[in-house]
Amino acid sequence: MASAAPASSICIKSASCSALAPGRISSLRSVSLPVSRKSFFSRRGSFSLRVNCQAKPETVTKVCNIVKKQLALPDDSDVSGVSKFSALGADSLDTVEIVMGLEEEFGISVEEESAQSIQTVQDAADLIEKLMEKKGH
């Protein structure tokens, strides 16, 4: 019978979060936490937890709206950062059209290689933030 790993938790606090956007505790964009201990099924193992929060909520909202428009979804459709394009009914052509809409809206150019890695709304929003940062916006 397999035994589960003991639970552990991590708490991150910021003393100066009043000037930051709601929901953000610092200006950090990512945190990596290496963990090494017994894992599930009583096997020794190590893994790394990476929390990546690049895109601003406003960017995610804009991407959600563009996705709804490109896929002709009703305004009350449940589209969020975790929404997969394929689960929303998008095929490869729809995804290309979504990327073109994002390029137009945000004034960016997405390389084909990067466009192929976009699976979710959050992926798209993170890529947009990264490209806009490179562009100097």
From Swiss-Prot:
Keywords: Chloroplast, Fatty acid biosynthesis, Fatty acid metabolism, Lipid biosynthesis, Lipid metabolism, Phosphopantetheine, Phosphoprotein, Plastid, Transit peptide. It is found in: Plastid, Chloroplast. Pfam families: PP-binding. SUPFAM superfamilies: ACP-like (SSF47336). The keyword Plastid applies. InterPro entries: ACP (IPR003231), ACP-like_sf (IPR036736), ACP_chloroplastic (IPR044813), PP-bd_ACP (IPR009081), Ppantetheine_attach_site (IPR006162). 4'-phosphopantetheine is transferred from CoA to a specific serine of apo-ACP by acpS. This modification is essential for activity because fatty acids are bound in thioester linkage to the sulfhydryl of the prosthetic group. The modification O-(pantetheine 4'-phosphoryl)serine is found at residue 92. GO terms for cellular component: chloroplast. GO terms for molecular function: acyl carrier activity. HAMAP family: Acyl_carrier. This is Acyl carrier protein 2, chloroplastic. It comes from Cuphea lanceolata.
